[in-house]
């Protein structure tokens, strides 16, 4: 008999500024790493003000991780030290494995209405893969299957499997699943997940009950004391839902529907040494990576 996962913890994304001045909401980062292993960071960038995104993320290094960029609206111009140039457009995904090291830039441009929106997820690599050759999975919107389920539920499968349909991103070491799910009001979405994996949901818009219980959970909300706690059993937009143990998730909507990312992966369970865009296992490995970046020996594969 399957066990539906209960909510372990919920929290709201928090505003921050990254890159050369990009305003975004950080769903999770450094402080949550032990709970969300193998995932390190999730940024939500949504704005209709070009001043908040046009300066972008100029040239910077990565080593030891994968960055997964999912654009909802607008365009991101991408270039890297391997000589690649391209666009990540609305509905596209770029799954970049930095491995031993890559230097790249990401410059958001927005759409005709100056709207820019999307997400970037960072996933850790195990020690055995941190120095692998960098690689890309550039996936266009039309290559991402969308499955229609009972009640008008729709799910885009970026990575993983739903109803026998497999997403285009495969052969990832932590065996992740990455779905974009839309659940209309008055319906319930259930989905099997692997018991050994960590599972989270991130609410893009709308609201819903993210397990079968209706217990109230503490939410951090911006208030007079910045992190006041508010009790609620409904998870709304820009909320992270961290699940406990089990082999199935269930999301129910009443009057209003909900759209969310459902992300899961196998924990690596290794030490994490992290500073800025580089994530290794030890402080010595981290020191060496930045030393190599400064002296021009950072790139191990491809063009420098």
Question: Where in this protein do the model-derived segments appear?
Answer:
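Jelly-roll (double-stranded beta-helix
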Residues: 1-304
